[in-house]
């Protein structure tokens, strides 16, 4: 990671660390379980073994903040002081919708801590309800991957704008790709062509239209995401051969 940061500094490129709390944390929690079973039992959620307990659990918050502290220090880039961002997660949280107050309280606590380290915290959109957004700390910016189908949490980009949240487009269709050995070069070329017509920085995934154009001042950018769950058996060369054509397609169109 240090070599990556040094290389990025030479190119004047800001690196955004991406973590995921309180859910999608099974690997992190497994390490804690191996080293301190007592602590593990105190911070594990009753809902899922990949989720930290977000119900006013001070120890769970402290453990999260220690991880944030380690990552923010590791990724620090002085030339981007007060501009750096960190993704803290907040997506697909078991119980997060039904217990929105506790979920938002947890996200506010860890977001405040990241902000104190000089980073802008970011979180995914899907677990925030129409009530929850009212108390979510504005330190956060929102990564919008798709509109939730639940009426309680189907906020649009415009809804987030009403509460002064900046939003980044992570469209679940046009800006997602999962590299895999099953894809041929023709498949990659087809995906690159798809990005060419489907992507625009303001085309968001809404339930009735995955390419819904949004004209709102709070749209601050977009990102192309690669997810690695199908790529564990791929070499670095194979990964690069699939990803680079899509990256080129994305940047050629980015405004």
Where are these regions (language model features)?
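Active-site-proximal loop/turn and secondary-structure-junction residues that shape catalytic pockets
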Residues: 19-25, 92-94, 127-129, 146-148, ...
């Amino acid at each position: 990671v240090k070599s990556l940061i040094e290389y990025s500094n030479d190119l004047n490129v800001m690196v955004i660390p991406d973590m995921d709390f309180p859910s999608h944390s099974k690997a992190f929690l497994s390490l804690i379980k191996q080293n301190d079973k007592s602590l593990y039992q105190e911070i594990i959620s009753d809902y899922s073994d990949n989720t930290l307990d977000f119900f006013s659990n001070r120890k769970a918050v402290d453990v999260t903040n220690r991880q944030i502290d380690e990552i923010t220090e590791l990724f620090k880039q002085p030339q981007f002081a007060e501009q750096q961002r960190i993704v803290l997660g907040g997506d697909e949280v078991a119980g997060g919708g039904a217990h929105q107050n506790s979920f938002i309280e947890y996200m506010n606590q860890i977001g405040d801590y990241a902000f104190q380290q000089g980073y802008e915290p970011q979180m995914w959109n899907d677990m925030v309800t129409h009530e929850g957004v009212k108390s979510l700390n504005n330190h956060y910016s929102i990564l919008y991957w798709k509109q939730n189908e639940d009426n309680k949490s189907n906020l649009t980009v415009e809804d987030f704008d009403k509460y002064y949240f900046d939003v980044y487009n992570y469209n679940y269709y046009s800006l997602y790709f999962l590299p895999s050995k099953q894809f041929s070069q023709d498949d990659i070329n087809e995906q690159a062509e798809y990005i060419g017509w489907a992507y625009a920085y303001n085309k968001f995934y809404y339930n009735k239209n995955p390419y819904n154009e949004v004209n709102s001042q709070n749209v601050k950018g977009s990102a192309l995401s690669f997810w690695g769950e199908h790529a564990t058996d791929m070499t670095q060369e194979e990964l690069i051969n699939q990803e680079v054509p899509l990256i080129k397609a994305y940047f050629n169109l980015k405004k």
